[in-house]
Amino acid sequence: YIKWEVLSMSSYQPPSASGSPRFCNMGNFMRLPHAENAEGLDFAIVGIPFDTAASFRAGARFGPNGIRNISAMIKPNNVAMGVNIMDELKGADLGDVPVIPDYIHETYAAIENTLTGVLNEGAVPISLGGDHAITLGELRAIYKKHGKVALVHFDSHLDLCDTVFGQK
């Protein structure tokens, strides 16, 4: 009988790979604890599995889970620099925003409401998307909390058009 190390909200540390293989207990970013809210956290991971606004092909909705799965390999410490980010920061994975496929405006509202809650609880939201459209809900939440913001959007291709297939 093997007793697996349980994720602890008291330490906000991912479990040691020597106590539980990295392919076990997958689902949370960096194998961090899951939390119901962002109270007491410095940062909160929030998935936004939405791709209804993608003009080419669907699939970005699988981004948050894909990122979470591969993030199991990330170590919170930098051996060369002797720094463990989790010694200084408290973070957890809050799961996914309750998006509504095919309903863009309702999903914008869900993103805005979720991230407004995270910001009001004092944490910095780190979003895992999702298509480009999720940014609008994120910016609305940030604007509510902090006022005017600027956005620099880096992408691998120039696809931010004013109209696509005759639609604005």
Which residue stretches match the model-derived regions?
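Short, Lys/Arg-enriched N-terminal segments with co-localized hydrophobic residues
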Residues: 1-8
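Conserved alpha-helical scaffold segments that buttress catalytic/binding sites
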Residues: 10-168
